[in-house]
A protein has these predicted regions:
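Histidine-acidic metal/acid-base catalytic patches
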Residues: 24, 30-45, 58-61, 132, ...
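Generic enzyme active-site microenvironment
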Residues: 69, 94, 172-173, 199, ...
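Acidic-and-aromatic substrate-binding clefts and catalytic sites of carbohydrate-active enzymes
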Residues: 50-57, 69-84, 103-105, 109-110, ...
Length: 282
């Protein structure tokens, strides 16, 4: 049972103890030992990213029948203009702050300041619904601007920390894909966030060839999707090259929240089935 309307029960993600076969092949005895020892009731959820062609209300209605944790992509058709929409639902929400048209590392101070304002506005909504927030770490347009962009990011980081502290909001920076101008692409880049919360995007890490190293870090949230290691397709689990057995082991180790973040609702359903084949059930 999903979170549903107010009064409905809560659903959680369970790791089974009778795993035998994984889609990418037979699990090694070590993989079997790790996953079979995972504790049950590990919570997972779904991002509204799969339903961006629908209204936010319709997306919440459909996803709340499946899960008790929903990450809302707070832009486009799912931009939250009024937090009262969430009063019709129980369960837990996470907000993915707007990312198109904003850059908290912009060399242009006016753009940086406006981008921070967009983030803090998202924090204000998060306070109303008790949600954590995921943020993109910004980018630079030219290699010659990289140091300036780092300085701008550090200024934004301090302002965001102050705003989050004032509102008692937890936020995470997400690792980016394989385009060179993005901040935070590899574990070596984690220093830039200076101990602030980290959201591990599994697909993005795979694109940069550093997923195993990222799985050894500390993170508080995770985006689950698959790809072939070349394109950021946000494909259903099992359609790409990612081995999700160690991913689930890292989730168990950290106790992080996680959401499926694929492009289509059918992809969500396929991902649930694929995760079920390695002992995960909603």
């Amino acid at each position: 049972m999903g979170q549903g309307r107010v009064g409905a029960g809560m659903a959680e993600l369970a790791i089974g103890n009778n795993l035998q076969i994984y889609r990418h092949g037979t699990m090694t005895s070590f993989q079997y030992f790790i996953v079979s020892r995972m504790q049950p009731l590990m919570m997972a959820g779904i991002s509204t990213y799969c339903l961006l062609d629908r209204s936010l209300e319709e997306a919440l209605d459909r996803l709340s029948d499946i899960t008790s944790l929903i990450e809302v992509v707070d832009e486009g058709p799912h931009f939250i203009s009024d937090a009262s929409i969430f009063s019709n639902y129980s369960g837990k929400f996470i907000l993915h702050a707007p990312y198109h048209g904003v850059n908290i590392a912009s060399s242009f101070e006016a753009i940086r300041e406006a981008s921070v304002k967009v983030m803090t506005d998202c924090f204000s909504v998060a306070v109303e619904i008790g949600a954590d927030v995921v943020i993109h770490p910004g980018y630079y347009a030219w290699e010659q601007e990289r140091e300036r962009a780092n300085q701008q990011f550090r200024a934004s980081l301090q302002e965001l920390r102050d705003a989050a502290a004032e509102r008692s909001v937890t936020f995470y920076f997400e690792n980016m894909g394989d385009m060179n101008f993005f901040n935070l692409r590899t574990p070596a880049d984690l220093d830039i966030i200076d101990g602030t919360g980290f959201a591990l995007d599994v697909g993005h890490a795979n694109l940069n060839g550093c997923l195993p190293a990222f799985l050894e870090t500390t993170f508080g949230h995770m985006h689950i999707h698959d790809n072939d290691g070349k394109r950021d397709t946000h494909s259903p689990v099992g359609e790409g090259s990612i081995d999700f057995v160690p991913v689930l082991a890292a989730l168990q180790r950290t106790g992080a929240t996680s959401v499926i973040e694929v492009k289509t609702f059918a992809g969500v359903q396929e991902s649930i089935r694929a995760l079920g084949r390695i002992g995960v059930a909603f």
